[in-house]
């Protein structure tokens, strides 16, 4: 199981991403807009750089909902491979069955 502090850190990052998502999208739109002047683009880039680093969506890492494990997490289930196998063998994951051919 992951340390509780690491799980809380990821939750804090998710909150920051949600808080700054709209502002970040607006600044990126200005930067990518063809009709923007160089000064507008320059100002938008500076404002974007001044936003918190953890407000970027790429900083958030998927974690297992049960254990908090950061690696080998299946997006569809939100579980790491170990817990997914454990739950699948117990029949707790609807629609999932062991492959046999």
UniProtKB/Swiss-Prot annotation:
Gene3D superfamilies attached here?
A: 1.10.287.1480
State one Pfam family annotation. Answer: Ribosomal_S14
Molecular functions per Gene Ontology = rRNA binding; structural constituent of ribosome
Q: Check the record and name the InterPro entries matching this protein.
A: Ribosomal_uS14 (IPR001209), Ribosomal_uS14_bac/plastid (IPR023036), Ribosomal_uS14_CS (IPR018271)
Source domain of life = Bacteria
User: Which UniProt key words apply to this protein?
Assistant: Ribonucleoprotein, Ribosomal protein, RNA-binding, rRNA-binding
A GO biological process of this protein is: translation
Give Gene Ontology CC terms: cytoplasm; small ribosomal subunit
The entry describes its oligomerization and partners as: Part of the 30S ribosomal subunit. Contacts proteins S3 and S10.
* Entry function: Binds 16S rRNA, required for the assembly of 30S particles and may also be responsible for determining the conformation of the 16S rRNA at the A site.
Q: Which family does it belong to?
A: Belongs to the universal ribosomal protein uS14 family.
- Descriptive protein name: Small ribosomal subunit protein uS14
Source species, please?
Answer: Francisella tularensis subsp. novicida (strain U112)
Task: Show the taxonomic lineage.
Answer: Bacteria, Pseudomonadati, Pseudomonadota, Gammaproteobacteria, Thiotrichales
In the UniProt record, the gene name given for this protein reads: rpsN
């Amino acid at each position: 199981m992951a340390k509780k502090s690491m799980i809380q850190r990821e939750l804090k990052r998710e909150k920051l991403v949600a808080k700054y998502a709209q502002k970040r999208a607006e600044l990126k739109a200005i930067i990518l807009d063809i009709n923007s002047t160089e000064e507008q683009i320059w100002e938008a880039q500076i404002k974007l750089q001044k936003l918190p680093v953890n407000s970027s969506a790429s900083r958030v890492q998927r974690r297992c909902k049960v254990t908090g494990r950061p690696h080998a997490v299946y997006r569809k289930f939100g579980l790491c491979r170990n817990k997914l196998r454990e739950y699948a063998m117990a029949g707790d994951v609807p629609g999932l069955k062991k492959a046999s051919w």
